[in-house]
Amino acid sequence: MNKKLKIIIAGLLVNVASMNAIATEVGSTYFTAGVMKISTDELDVLAASGVTIDDEDTAVTFGVGYQFDENLSFEAGVIGESEASATLSGSESGTINGKSYSISGALTIKAQTDTSYTLGMRYSSPVNENLDVYGKAGLLFWDLKGLVSADGTLTYDGSTYTASGTAQFYQNDGNDPYFGMGGSYKLNQTTSLDLDYIKMEVDDGDVDGLSLAVNVDF
């Protein structure tokens, strides 16, 4: 048997083995658990001198998927709570009714996203026996709250007064599409490590998510 024929046969055997490996996954269920780094432009409209914006947070993620085709799976997931905040701080002093006063304090506005849910599809394609790349798309179901909190101190005529409090000034919920891509590296026969990036929209604000999760087949 010449060298070229050996190479062809070896290639066919590898392809058959790969097809068999994929076929055994059809009809299986998998679970994922991980963390997602979230960044949003929800509060960028408040950007100005003296305003500090924190637009990143970390949320836990959980998901379940069903492989109904060699490449396609149906997925449902949960993304934990996250928030972005903008803090406006300052101080002022002067006189009122002939008596001195000074004010120092901070106002914080938060865009708080409660637990969100995803429903979508994932298309996977093998690169080699251990690595898959995939794309995903679906709907994100979200619930957003706007909170404002104030912490301040007033000193008037030598007496100091402190006030603080938090109030909700906005609430909305809805659903918007998401899409993303990623890669899955097989650690063993049942466990993989998924790394992906998704693009979402929450209440007209753009949200980016970079997640790392453990994927376990059953």
Give residue spans per PLM region:
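Outer-membrane beta-barrel strand-turn architecture
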Residues: 25, 67-70, 125-129, 141, ...
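Repeated loop/turn-to-beta-strand initiation elements of outer-membrane beta-barrel proteins
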Residues: 29-31, 71-74, 130-133, 185-195
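Hydrophobic, lipid-facing positions within transmembrane beta-strands of outer-membrane proteins
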Residues: 29, 58-62, 115-119, 177-181, ...
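Short glycine/proline- and aromatic-enriched beta-strand/turn motifs that initiate or cap beta-hairpins
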Residues: 21-70, 74, 141
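Transmembrane beta-barrel strands of outer-membrane/channel proteins
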Residues: 31-37, 76-80, 135-139, 195-199
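Solvent-exposed loop/turn segments connecting transmembrane beta-strands
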Residues: 127, 173-175, 200-209
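Residues on the lipid-exposed face of transmembrane beta-strands in outer-membrane beta-barrel proteins
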Residues: 62-66, 119-123, 137-139, 181-185, ...
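Extracellular/periplasm-exposed beta-strand and loop segments of Gram-negative cell-envelope proteins
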Residues: 39-57, 80-115, 142-174, 201
